[in-house]
Design a protein with these regions (language model features):
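Donor nucleotide-sugar binding loop of glycosyltransferases
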Residues: 12-15, 43, 96
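Catalytic metal- and UDP-sugar-binding loop of GT-A-like glycosyltransferases, i.e.
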Residues: 61, 89-91
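A conserved acidic beta->alpha catalytic loop
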Residues: 40-48, 93
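Short beta-strand/loop segment that forms part of the nucleotide-sugar
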Residues: 7, 20, 32-42, 89
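Acceptor/aglycone-binding surface of glycosyltransferases and processive sugar-polymer synthases
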Residues: 63, 67-80, 85, 97-178, ...
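Hydrophobic helical membrane-anchoring modules
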Residues: 1-3, 143, 148-150, 173-238
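Short, well-formed alpha-helical segments that are part of the catalytic scaffolds
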Residues: 12-27
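Short loop->beta transition adjacent to catalytic acidic/histidine clusters or analogous donor-positioning motifs
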Residues: 2-3, 24-37, 46
Length: 238
């Protein structure tokens, strides 16, 4: 099985070296082929220089496309290079590479097409737990997804996700620009693909500063809910 880690990075000079190094160390002890590609999303700091100086595999976008455009670039790369599984893995050091093998199991067993690394399932809590307000917002989004698709997904905003070949093809063709995680869950469930949540450990970000503010959180909630409703009820070609 060939697995590709897609690492979107925008101004991650403080964390990108450690993020890639963690993958390089981890792949020495797994029984599948593990590759990676960093999608440098038009960074204006030293991210590009760090990637080039260390000869890390990367695609350098000439302008900032945002998280959706960067991740879709990674899925197009995975499709073009015929990977069996693509893994979204944040460049800021929040995702724990040690969770990967467990997350991969449902795809290996043909039990899932999309696996979501979740902070909210299982007996062992993730080292990083988000704020009450964000958990409340995630709960609202979860209820809306349940209402529109019939399936409960708890960690609707997790960026730690694994896609099999059929979902890679879907995401390479169509991927939302602004709020990709909740909207793509609806998109995949509408097409009767199997979505599974598995426990995943996550850390506090190791570098940079989160841009989330209370005002942005409220706007995010309104826009995400709108995008979910549009995705749920619009007709699209396969």
């Amino acid at each position: 099985m060939r697995v590709l880690m897609i690492i979107p990075a925008y101004n991650e000079e403080e964390s990108i070296f450690d993020t890639v190094t963690s993958i390089l160390n981890y792949r020495k002890k797994v029984d599948f082929d593990l590759d990676y590609v960093v999608i440098n999303d038009g960074s204006t700091d030293m991210t590009k220089q760090i990637l080039e100086e260390n000869h890390f595999n990367a695609v350098h976008l000439v302008m900032n496309l945002g998280i959706g455009g960067a991740v879709q670039t990674g899925y197009k790369y995975a499709l073009a290079h015929d990977y069996d599984v693509a893994v979204q893995f944040d460049g800021d050091g929040q995702h724990d590479i040690e969770s990967l093998s467990d997350l991969l199991e449902p795809i290996r067993k043909n039990e899932a097409d999309l696996v979501i690394g979740s902070r909210f399932v299982g007996d062992v809590k993730s080292e990083f737990q988000t704020t009450f307000m964000r958990r409340f917002g995630i709960g609202v989004i979860s209820n809306l997804i349940k209402w529109t698709t019939g399936q409960r997904v708890l960690d609707t905003t997790s960026g730690y996700r694994l896609a099999d070949k059929v979902v890679i093809k879907q995401f390479a063709r169509r991927y939302p620009i602004k709020y990709p995680e909740p909207e793509t869950i609806v998109h995949i469930l509408k097409r009767k693909y199997k979505v599974v949540e598995k426990p995943a450990n996550m850390f506090e970000r190791t570098g940079g500063v989160s841009s989330i503010t209370p005002i942005k959180s409220i706007r995010y909630m309104l826009e995400v809910c709108s995008s979910i409703l549009i995705a749920a009820f619009m007709r699209e070609s396969e």
